[in-house]
Every structure is written in structure tokens, then in C-alpha cells.
């Protein structure tokens, strides 16, 4: 699909609220049960921004997408790192997996491109991590599953190359303006969205959380709200006049850092 395409949705002036959640990780049965049991009538006039890491399994993605599409007026998605794992797939690379997930979104009418809802624009920003938040230590290099579960074509020799590839998909989106602009990514656009209370020994994961170059694109777009996932640490913080929001559902054990519910980031006038 053409990732730079922009779609205008007419007749959606009745959209009332924009909700977000990320990192559903529905390979945990209790997480799958939660998403499938969402109220079937409460959100029919609302938009959901689903900021990645639902599942690496395409069948699980289909199940989740079909359920959410029946409950929301529109569902916006962006693949996370888990969606691009290929260790159990018959695909040659994680880029092929990205295209497979993109095609799935297209076939199920899940939005993976910029959409304008009259006074509101919702803009996906693709990315990866590039070690601009720090260099991975030996422990992270050995433990981080992406380094084994993802496979990239030869021309993408480094994580920085992968990040550049995805950032290039965003370039035509960065001059979009509207009364309200919400952008979203899976990865973190700046490391200072992480709370100061994170213990030092947990910060060893920071190199694989996101990219300063993604942050530069967010600043260029200058949205009202930027939604991100990946860190599993819920957050809502304003930095340089942009509200950064994380509402990761996270793993079942991560109750202290995750709300475990949908989060409304915007309510529009009816």
C-alpha cells in the first residue's frame, strides 16, 4: 500500500472521543479476553488509536482488528516491533512482514495512513530505534528478542538503517496542519518522556526504546498530541507545547505502570 497516502473521511463529524491503547500483547490470554470483551456499543462514535505491539501472529491481529472495528467508528494502527517478528513466519524479512501487516490493515479497513476527520487529523509516524538514546550493553544485546526474531534485508545493515527506512515513509506527512492534529508512533520520540523514577538498572533498555530523529519529525509536524507505545510505562506529559501520551496495556504483571484501560486523549464537540 502507499504509506504516504492521505485519506479524507467525510460524514464523521459525529466523532465524539479519541481513545488510545498500545502494547496489548494478546498472546497473554487475559489480555486477549480484555480486548474482546470491550463494550460493543459504548464507542461506536469514537476513534481508537492502537499504537502497536498487539501480536506477532497475523491470525491474532485479524481477531483483534475485527473485534475493534465492530466497536469503534475507526481504528488507527501502527506496527510495533512484535508485529515484525518473523521467526515463526514463512517470510523472508521483517520488511515483508511489515507489508503483510499493512495489507491486512488495508483489507480490514484499519487505518495505517493519515486521515482527516474535518477539524481533526490523525497522522501515523513509522520508525524504529537507532541507539540515539544510548548504546546497548552486552546484557541487552543478548536478551533483546528483536535481535533474533527480526530479519532485515542486506541493505538495512543496522538499526539506524531500519529507522531511516521507516522515517522516510513519514516525510510527506510532516507539513500537515488542522485545528487539532494527533500523531502517533510505536516507538518513543524522545527519552525524556520516561519518568524520572525509573530505577537505574531498568534504564539499560533505553537504547531500544526509540529515536531522536523520530522526535525531530514530531517537532516538525508539531501536533497537539503525540501518542506512543513500547515503553509499557503510562505517561501524559507536556514538552515544548506537545502533549505526549502512553497508554500501554502491557503484560498482566505490569499493574503498577499501566492503567489497564482505554484512555481518552480528546473529546470533540458534537
Report residues per predicted region.
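Beta-strand-turn-beta hairpins that frame and shape the catalytic cleft
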Residues: 11-19, 114-124, 180, 238-243
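Glycine/small-residue-rich loop that forms an oxyanion/phosphate-binding "nest" at active or ligand-binding sites
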Residues: 87-111
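Short amphipathic alpha-helices and their capping/turn segments at secondary-structure boundaries
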Residues: 38, 62-69, 106-119, 166-179
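Binuclear metal-dependent phosphoesterase catalytic core
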Residues: 106-108, 195-222, 232-270
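Active-site-proximal loop/helix segment associated with metal-binding centers of metalloenzymes
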Residues: 123-205
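Active-site environment of divalent metal-dependent phosphoester hydrolases
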Residues: 25-30, 55-59, 82-89, 113-115, ...
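Active-site neighborhood of phospho(di)ester-bond hydrolases with catalytic His/Asp-centered motifs
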Residues: 20-22, 48-53, 76-81, 113, ...
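N-terminal active-site segment of His-dependent metallophosphoesterases
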Residues: 2-77, 84-92, 270
Amino acid at each position: 500500500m502507499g504509506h504516504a497516502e492521505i485519506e479524507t473521511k467525510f460524514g464523521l463529524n459525529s466523532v465524539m472521543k479519541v481513545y488510545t491503547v498500545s502494547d496489548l500483547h494478546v498472546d497473554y490470554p487475559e489480555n486477549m479476553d480484555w480486548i474482546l470483551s470491550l463494550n460493543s456499543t459504548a464507542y461506536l462514535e469514537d476513534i481508537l488509536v492502537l499504537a502497536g505491539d498487539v501480536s506477532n501472529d497475523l491470525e491474532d491481529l485479524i481477531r483483534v482488528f475485527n473485534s475493534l472495528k465492530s466497536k469503534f467508528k475507526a481504528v488507527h494502527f501502527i506496527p510495533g516491533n512484535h508485529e515484525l517478528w518473523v521467526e515463526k513466519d514463512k517470510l523472508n524479512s521483517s520488511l515483508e512482514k511489515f507489508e503483510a501487516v499493512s495489507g491486512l490493515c488495508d483489507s480490514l479497513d484499519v487505518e495505517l495512513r493519515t486521515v482527516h476527520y474535518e477539524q481533526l487529523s490523525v497522522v501515523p509516524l513509522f520508525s524504529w530505534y537507532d541507539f540515539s538514546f544510548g548504546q546497548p550493553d552486552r546484557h541487552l544485546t543478548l536478551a533483546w528478542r528483536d535481535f533474533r526474531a527480526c530479519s532485515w534485508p542486506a541493505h538495512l545493515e543496522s538499526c539506524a538503517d531500519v529507522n531511516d527506512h521507516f522515517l522516510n515513509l513519514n516525510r510527506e506527512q510532516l507539513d500537515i496542519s488542522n485545528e487539532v492534529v494527533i500523531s502517533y508512533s510505536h516507538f518513543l520520540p524522545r527519552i525524556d518522556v520516561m519518568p524520572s523514577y525509573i530505577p537505574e538498572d531498568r534504564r539499560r533498555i533505553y537504547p531500544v526504546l526509540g529515536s531522536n530523529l523520530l522526535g525531530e519529525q514530531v517537532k516538525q509536524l508539531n501536533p497537539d498530541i503525540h501518542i506512543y507505545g513500547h515503553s509499557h510505562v503510562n505517561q501524559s506529559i507536556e514538552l515544548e507545547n506537545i502533549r505526549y501520551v502512553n497508554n500501554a496495556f502491557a503484560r498482566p504483571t505490569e499493574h503498577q505502570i499501566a492503567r489497564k484501560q482505554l484512555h481518552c486523549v480528546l473529546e470533540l464537540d458534537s
